[in-house]
Amino acid sequence: MHKDNDSGSGSNPGQVSNYLIVRPHRGGYIDLFRYGVRDDQTSKAKFLEMPDNREWSTITIDEEAEDHRWVIVVSILVRKIIRLLRTPMEFTGFVVDFFLNLFSANGGFFGLLLRLIQAKVVIPERGSVTFVSTIGQLDGRISLYKEWNFVEHLEGIDSVDSGRVKIELGSRGLMDLCVMASKLAYENAKVVENVVDLHWKMNLVEFLDCWNDYQKQMSTQVFVFTDKQKDANLIVISFRGTEPFDADDWGTDFDYSWYEVPNVGKLHMGFLEAMGLGNRDDTTTFHYNLFEQTSSEEENSKKNLLDMVERSAYYAVRVILKRLLSEHENARFVVTGHSLGGALAILFPTLLVLNEETEIMKRLLGVYTFGQPRIGNREVGLFMKAQLNQPVDRYFRVVYCNDIVPRLPYDDKTFLYKHFGLCLFYDSFYNETKAEDEPDPNPYGLRYKILGHVIAVWELVRGLTMGYTHGPDYKEGWFRILFRLMGLVIPGLSDHCMTDYVNSVRLGPDNELQMSSL
C-alpha cells in the first residue's frame, strides 16, 4: 500500500538531485481549493515537495505555467478519490474475478444453474492454470496471428555482428506476438506457462514478482520467454500493466512526480519505484539504485546490490537477459508491455543506456508498447532517440483512438511530460497513422468530450456486430460489451482495453517498418 512518510525525503547522506513529489494526502480539500483558486503558497507547499535548495523557478518554465495549476489540482483530486476507493476497488476486483471464473468454469450462467441443481459446481481456484484475470475475461484470445510463421522470419537472420541486416520485424506478425505477450502478462504464472509452452510452442524462462519499496509489496510482474529452448533467435520481455481494480496502479498513472537524472532528464518517479529503483520517502535511494557503485568506499554495498537483484524488476530482468544473451549467441531481444507495463518496457532500455550496457543494447531488436503513459520530459526523449531510433526506428508506441492512458500525465508547462518514438495511431476503424504524437495529446475541452461520446456509441455498435463482420475470433462477449457501455460515461476508458489493441494489430494494414540489428 502507498504510504506517505511525513519525514519527507529522508536525511541519508548522498547525491542530492532535482525532483518534484506530488503528495495528494498531506493537505485537505480546503487546501486544494485554496491552491486551485487562489494559488495559496502555503497550501501549495503541502502538496508539492522539492529539494530544500531548489526554488520554484527551477521547476516551472515561466509565469504562464502557473495558469496550468488546475492540471495539478485535478491530478491530486483524482488520486485522493482513488485512494478513498482503494478498498472497495480491491473487494470489487476480488468478487468480479471470482464470479467471472465461476461462470466460465461451469459453462456460463445457465450452465452454472444446471450444475447447482446437479450439485456439481466447479469452484475456481486462484493461481491455477484455469483461473483467468479480468483482462483475460474481456478478451479470451490466446492464439497468435495464424498467418505468420514466426521461426521462418527469424532463422534467416545472421549474427548480430553481421552489419545492418534489415528485416521486416515491424510487420503484423511480431506486433501480434508483442501485443499478445502484453495481454498475457496480466495472468498468473501457471496460465503464462501454459500459454507460452503449450499453445505458442515456445519456452518460458522466468515469471517474476518484483519488489516496489514505496508500496512495500511485490507489485511489479514481468515474464521472459524465448522462441525455443536451444539456439534461440528471439528473447521477449513482457511487463504487466495497470490492473483494472488496482488503485495503486491507477494512482501511479495519474502521478506527476519526477526525479531528474543528470544528462538524461526528468523520469517519472512512480515508474522508477515500480522498477524497484527507489522510494520517494528517501529520494537518495534513487541515485544509489540507478548507479551501481564501484568505488572502494562502497564495497560494503555489494550485499545490498545482490539483494536488489533478487527484488528489483530492473536488476532481476537484466541478470536474466545477460545470461540468455550469453547462452544464445544469435538471439536478440524485444521488450513490450501495455499501459503501466508499456512505461516499464521503454524505461528498461533507458536504464540500460544510463548504466552504459552497450553490449546489451546492441542486441536490442525493438520495443513495442501499447497504451503507454508518458515516462519523462523532452530531454529524456532526445537522450533516447539517439540510442533507439538511429539509423532506424526500434521503438514503436501503439495508441488506439481515445485511450486516455497514453495522454497521461498531461503534457503541460509545469511538468513537461513528453512522448518520444514513432507513434502508430489507430482510429475507431482500425486505420493506421504514423506520427510523432497521437491526436489530442491533452484531452480536454468540449470538442474532445462530444467527439469522445460519439465514438463510444460507434464502438458499442461495432462491438455488437464484429462477430458477424469479421468472424468468430472478433466476437465480443457480454462482459466486453458491458465495459463498452462504461465508455459512454467515461470516453477513453473502454479504449484502453486490450481488445482494441489486438484488433488494431490484426485488422490494421501490414506494416512495412524496418528494424536493423545495428
Swiss-Prot record:
One GO cellular component assignment for this chain's record is:
lipid droplet
Q: Which residues cross the membrane?
A: 93-113
Listed Gene3D superfamilies: alpha/beta hydrolase (3.40.50.1820)
List the membrane topology term(s): Single-pass membrane protein
Q: Where is this motif: GXSXG?
A: 337-341
SUPFAM superfamilies linked:
alpha/beta-Hydrolases
Query: What does the UniProt note on pH dependence state?
Result: Optimum pH is 5.5.
Question: Where is the protein localized?
Answer: Lipid droplet; Membrane
Q: What residues sit in the active site?
A: S339, D403, H496
Give the chief site where it resides: other
Q: Annotated Gene Ontology MF terms?
A: monoacylglycerol lipase activity; triacylglycerol lipase activity
- Assigned EC number: 3.1.1.-
Q: Does the keyword Membrane apply?
A: yes
- Phenotype seen when the gene is deleted: Reduced pollen tube growth.
Per the record, what are the reactions this protein catalyses? 1,2-di-(9Z-octadecenoyl)-glycerol + (9Z)-octadecenoate + H(+) = 1,2,3-tri-(9Z-octadecenoyl)-glycerol + H2O; 1-(9Z-octadecenoyl)-glycerol + H2O = glycerol + (9Z)-octadecenoate + H(+)
Going by the entry's taxonomy, the superkingdom of the source organism is recorded as: Eukaryota
Under which main EC class is this enzyme filed? hydrolase
Q: In which tissues is it expressed?
A: Expressed in pollen grains, pollen tubes, developing embryos, developing seeds and germinating seeds.
Annotated GO biological process: lipid catabolic process
Name the keywords, alphabetized.
Answer: Hydrolase, Lipid degradation, Lipid droplet, Lipid metabolism, Membrane, Transmembrane, Transmembrane helix
Query: What is the similarity comment for this entry?
Result: Belongs to the AB hydrolase superfamily. Lipase family.
Protein purpose: Acid lipase that can hydrolyze a range of triacylglycerols without a clear preference for acyl-chains. Can also cleave 1,2-diacylglycerol, 1,3-diacylglycerol and 1-monoacylglycerol, but not phosphatidylcholine, phosphatidylethanolamine, or sterol esters. Required for pollen tube growth. Triacylglycerol hydrolysis by OBL1 may provide acyl groups for the synthesis of membrane lipids in growing pollen tubes.
Q: What is this protein called?
A: Triacylglycerol lipase OBL1
Which organism's genome codes for this protein?
A: Arabidopsis thaliana
Question: Its encoding gene is what?
Answer: OBL1
